[in-house]
Amino acid sequence: FPRNLFHTLDFTHEDLNKVNGSFKTGIAKEGWGKKGKAFIHNFPPPNVAYHFNAVMLQDYILSILKNKVKVVENNISSNELDANFIMDCSGKPKTLEKFDISSYIPVNSVHVTQCDWDYPRFQYTLTVARPYGWVFAIPLQDRCSVGYLYNKDINTLEDVKKDVNYIFDK
């Protein structure tokens, strides 16, 4: 993604400030596998990825490409458009009749919260196995975005919120 941003928009590492971004040098895993074993999957040098505020990145891209991009916010089929490139941001399929994968996915809900800070405390995506599911933490410049994925048919949101507080206290 950083290479694509650079080649299409001349987006540099310095532009990360404009989208509240931070460098991502790997993925840390805690509590997965053997008890007490944590590890970081580092990206080999010089590879790096980005964490960024998605809304700010969207605004940045649209401001750079305002005269080159037409945003269509409507329910249309791709054959109704004459375009070189189409990005479908509609999310899940309109009908889920043939798209039910719930029996394959053990989590079906997420609780997202933020913790404010004045600078990123780490340069990787943090993933932590927890009793009710798993947690991701994404560091941005002014905050850390934390999501707790769990199964709402087995656990309660209250239990998940208490466990998130335990993680913050750690």
Report the location of each language-model feature.
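N-terminal FAD cofactor-binding segment of flavoenzymes
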Residues: 1-37
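Tryptophan-centered motif/residue detector
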Residues: 13-14, 32-33, 50, 134, ...
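Flavin (FAD/FMN) cofactor-binding core of flavoprotein oxidoreductases
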Residues: 24, 169-170
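Mobile amphipathic helical/loop "lid" adjacent to a hydrophobic cofactor/ligand pocket
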Residues: 28-68
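Predominantly flavin-linked oxidoreductase catalytic cores and closely associated redox partners
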Residues: 59-168
